[in-house]
Amino acid sequence: MCIRDRFEGVIEQPEVDSLRVEMADLLDRAPVDNGSTVDKKGRPAFGQEFARPTFYLVEPLSDPWGGTEILNGRHPTKMNEPAPSSRVNEKVVFIMNGMCQTMPSGLRLYGHPDLLGIAASINGDDYVPYNDATFVKQPGVGGSVSWHQDGVTHWKSPDWDQGIHGFNFQVQLYDTGARSCLWVVPGTHKLGKIDIKRRLLEGSDSELMPDAVPLACNAGDVTVVNRQALHGSFANTSNDLRISLTFGF
């Protein structure tokens, strides 16, 4: 099962507009830092009633997971962390959780019949959801996600196959280019657990993985990526705003 594709214009403009409006409101009500109870205007921050934090903030243009044991240590290398072009003291929203409970438009998107039909065609009618996360890469400050494979649980399974860890949809709310979009190394979902450090060293660039390709998109496009595929994204030094609603099956 080779999944590294893009469906163009799946999400129609009225749906994109609704998602943009609700997302902008949430970002305006985000806490000023992880664990803070107030937003940048001094109001009570959104989402304090939920068991899981809605927002995860990072330093501008940083790589918060690379080279750490966070998320089961699946990001073994570190991306470059360029200095912001202007002095930015505040942390920035990087991840948002719980799209189904934070936005009515997010709940509708999760049940989009075309996307659920794609999920059934890949996994069969007995598929189940497992997670969602919205990646926010604001222009000139958005953080990076170092090279990784999403799967962590089934690498040694006696029933291992190329699709055992499932796949992710990413719904794009804005146009993205090479500096802001997701990058994927085609075919790596077939290789099992990859020695990511070694593979990066085999290339000629300290940050760009050999054979990686950009999944540049327009607003309303949906990418479909096997969770075993090697992928990552760079610090967003571009003028693009990238908001990618990510959910998998």
Name each model-derived stretch:
Residues 147-166:
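Acidic, His- and aromatic-enriched active-site or binding-groove loops in soluble protein domains
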Residues 8-147, 153:
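Non-heme Fe(II)-dependent double-stranded beta-helix
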